[in-house]
Amino acid sequence: MAARDPEATKARIFEAAVAEFARHGIAGARIDRIAAEARANKQLIYAYYGNKGELFASVLEKKMLDLAISVPVDPDDIEGWIDRLLDYHAAHPELLRLLFWEGMEYGTAELPHEAERQEHYARKVAAVRDGQERGVITDAIPAPDLLFLLVAMANWAVVVPQMKRILVGGGDAGTDGLRDSIKKAARRIVDR
């Protein structure tokens, strides 16, 4: 019999949960499918994470932390930051799908672990505010609003790929053109 490796099992559960939640949302996800994909016992998932909602929250928290580490907000190089953000989401579209599902499921209701999420975004807003205070980017738009606008521009094409395809085309030319337009728009929004 092979030795059990709890960390490897947790990693398989995590990856299976990311795929399941990105595909089906919180309500539509099934622990049975996650367990089968992860080659793990269903009871083990509950032991590790408590319930499906906690598993979703754990998955989303870890994916958001990965983004924050991989693509920190950079007010000194907005176009470069937008480029890196677009690249990240092209390589990891599941994060935006998870956030979209979360929005559909919770709407304006308070999220589980909302205080931690607010801290996460407060750090990003602080980076934007720092750029404003140093005169690198405009302070005509409040820092939280500015961050929201920039992130929305960069993320929307991944959230609704059908609209991107319909409006700008599905090939590389459409994608490259949209990327350039997003960067130009971002630069104009932040210019002093």
UniProtKB/Swiss-Prot annotation:
Binding of a wide range of cationic hydrophobic compounds to SCO4008 causes a decrease in DNA-binding, probably via allosteric conformational change of SCO4008. PROSITE patterns: HTH_TETR_2. Residues 7-67 form the HTH tetR-type domain. Induction: Autoregulated. Residues 30-49 bind DNA. GO terms for molecular function: DNA binding. It comes from the Bacteria. InterPro entries: Homeodomain-like_sf, HTH-type_TetR-like_transc_reg, HTH_TetR, Sco4008_C, Tet_transcr_reg_TetR-rel_C_sf. Keywords: DNA-binding, Repressor, Transcription, Transcription regulation. Contains an N-terminal DNA-binding domain and a C-terminal dimerization domain. Homodimer. Four dimers bind to the two operator sites. Probably regulates the expression of its own gene and the adjacent SCO4007 gene by binding to two operator sites in the SCO4007-SCO4008 intergenic region. This is HTH-type transcriptional repressor SCO4008.
